[in-house]
A protein has these predicted regions:
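Hydrophobic anchor residue at the start of the ABC signature
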Residues: 47
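Helical segment within the ABC ATPase nucleotide-binding domain
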Residues: 73-85
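ABC-family nucleotide-binding domains
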Residues: 61, 68
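A short, proline-enriched helix->beta-strand linker immediately N-terminal to the Walker B motif
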Residues: 52-56, 62
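A short, surface-exposed alpha-helical micro-motif characterized by mixed small hydrophobic
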Residues: 99-101
């Protein structure tokens, strides 16, 4: 039984190393607890956990909140790679530049109701703000 356990542990270590390389995790030791990492690297650990599962739809709520610009860029790269590889990503964000830069389609909600759905091709900050001020029935709130 110890032999089988050692094989599983070695496979887990190999998988962890591959995932850390894939997400470009900056950690001095692969066995370091995520709580000892920077906020950006903690977010990367979350992505590594997602990549270790065979998921095709990801719902990300404020994936870059509270992390520095360099870490945000790294998270955006990971998200773009996932989208290129067929993952569907639903991102919730309150950061306008993030929405404009990352989304293919934007759904604006106000008071729990959809007030606008827009393709990103010609999307502007003003259009998003206009929809965020509308009620779900189409009138000004």
């Amino acid at each position: 039984m110890l032999f089988r356990s050692a094989l599983n542990e070695q496979a887990e270590i190999t998988t962890a190393i591959e995932l850390c390389q894939k997400i470009q995790l900056k950690a001095s030791d692969i066995s370091a607890p995520p709580s000892s990492l920077s906020g950006g690297n903690q977010q990367k650990v979350v992505f590594a956990k997602l990549l270790n599962r065979d998921l095709k739809v990801l719902i990300l709520d404020e994936p870059t909140k509270g992390i520095d610009v360099g870490a945000k860029y790294s998270i955006y790269e990971i998200m773009n790679e996932l989208a290129t590889n067929g993952y569907a990503i639903i991102m919730v964000s309150s950061e306008m530049p993030e929405v404009l830069g990352m989304a293919d389609r934007v759904v604006v909600m106000r008071n729990g109701r959809v007030s606008g759905i827009m393709e990103n091709k010609e999307l502007t900050q003003e259009m998003i703000l206009e929809h965020s001020l509308k009620s779900a029935e189409g009138g000004e709130a």
